[in-house]
Amino acid sequence: MVSLKACVVAYGFTLLPALVSGSPLVPRYFQKHLVSRCNISAITVQSELGPQLSNTSLIFGPDNVLFPNATERWNTLDTPDVQLVVQPAAESDISKIVKYCNDNSIEFLVRNRGHGTTTSLSAFSGIEINVELLQGITIQPDGETAIFQAGTYGAEVINTLWDQGYVTTTGSTACVGLTGPSLGGGHSRYEGLYGLVMDNIVHYNIVLANGTEIGVNETSHPDLMWALKGAGHNFAIVTSLEKKIYPGENWHQHTYTWTQDKLETVFEALNTFHKSYNGTTPPKMGVNYGAIIMNTSYSTTEAVMEWGFQYAGPGDEAEALLAPFNAIGAIAEDQFDASYPTIAGTTSETCGSAKRAISSAMTLDYNITTERALYDHFVAKVAEYPDLAATAYLWHEGYSTEGYQIIPEDSTAYPHREENHLMVFFTEVPEDSDLLEPALDWAKEAMDLWNGGQPDRLPSTYVNYAQGADYETLESVYGYESWRLERLRSLKAEYDPENRFRYFVPIISDEA
């Protein structure tokens, strides 16, 4: 239950943005009960809100056996304070939940798969709207699009479509949701052919902060359509969306393990490869994922480079493109053809919940000198903190980019179309250890090295990988062109003047 003190603090912080944006002195959702309704139990919400919702909707608190799974987070470092969970069984329930929260001065936060990691989530205390029951997938009669409800996620989407002969853009890991990543862009194995996840969405059904249900597309609220594609967490709850689907095909994967003496050769080959198709990556070579990682099967003191290339087509086509990498002597390698669901499941080993220290960067190319420095730094840290070593990664995501870079940069709120690569450091921090600060320092130092390798460019932060650290700026996340944040804030004042959506990398924070 939310304490009265917490309610007073929340009231003060939430009211200030309303005053700044020119809203009435007391927002509507504070007028009826002010702070007293923050002290509210599951039984009370069940009796008051329950009759308004679909029969199979659920309302429960921390004493319910469903609560741990419903509130689990992929990263437990900074977690929201969930007092109660409401699981709507129908899209129409969501607007009723939002209106109830507004009328009773209760904050709300939407959760599907729980993969958001930013520190701003820890500012939340209130009701979680858990959309996991909304899992409908409907392929449209023309076979060009499908409608996905808010609770769908990667593996479910991929497998359902595959069984009908289709694929679509989803996040790179099968355990993450579909809608959440799309609000920040959504990098995908198919982006070289079809663009980001968000680039394929043609219609959103949403609930605004005041509980109003509207449809958003290129002709209905096109300004909000622009904002939802790249900064959508700040504006609405997506109850379902319609997005493009495509004919499915089998994929080819080739993985390599190289020792550190091949590092310069590998990154030289990668830089050449990513410009080998008219200045970009071959579109069907969807992605190469690479990690500098400890693998004690080979060495307990030196990290190795594990790299996997995934190609949307047959092996002979892929292997012709991979000839430069086949020429680099690997200590282990494997290749196979497989269905797309099998390929999509190859990055699921990190899906479990844990306390993680994370940082990220975006670059145009791989700075080879920097990668050597990162390797040496990694090995030194492994020696210093062996309890962090087993789960530490220097992760490289090299997508094919043609499909999303041909889309005009100003057509969506996503600001990073010129970036070619995503880099991430993460490690798991053992519970009840004193290794959190060293892990966070390691993360920042790795990010600083990546950014230092492109000194003539400003740092860029992919919003879905943002951590909310003080060294991340809103400009690095939402774009350095001044018009971008100006437009977002103008739309925020129009669609969410009371700043109800402020818990995931907010463009206007509690302190604003």
UniProtKB/Swiss-Prot annotation:
PANTHER family: BINDING OXIDOREDUCTASE, PUTATIVE (AFU_ORTHOLOGUE AFUA_1G17690)-RELATED (PTHR42973), FAD-BINDING PCMH-TYPE DOMAIN-CONTAINING PROTEIN (PTHR42973:SF8). Its cofactor is FAD. Induction: Expression is co-regulated with the other genes from the iso-A82775C biosynthesis cluster and probably controlled by the cluster-specific transcription factors iacI and iacK. Pathway: Secondary metabolite biosynthesis. InterPro entries: BBE, FAD-bd_PCMH, FAD-bd_PCMH-like_sf, FAD-bd_PCMH_sub2, FAD-linked_Oxidoreductase, Oxid_FAD_bind_N. Residues 1-22 form the signal peptide. PROSITE patterns: FAD_PCMH (PS51387). Residues 77-248 form the FAD-binding PCMH-type domain. It comes from Pestalotiopsis fici (strain W106-1 / CGMCC3.15140). The keyword Lyase does not apply. GO terms for molecular function: FAD binding; oxidoreductase activity. Disruption phenotype: Does not affect the production of iso-A82775C. This is FAD-linked oxidoreductase iacH. Keywords: FAD, Flavoprotein, Glycoprotein, Oxidoreductase, Signal. Iso-A82775C is a precursor for the biosynthesis of the anticancer natural products chloropestolides A to E via a Diesls-Alder reaction with maldoxin. In the absence of the prenyltransferase iacE, siccayne accumulates instead of iso-A82775C and can also be condensed with maldoxin to produce chloropestolides H to K, which show also antibacterial and anticancer properties. Belongs to the oxygen-dependent FAD-linked oxidoreductase family.
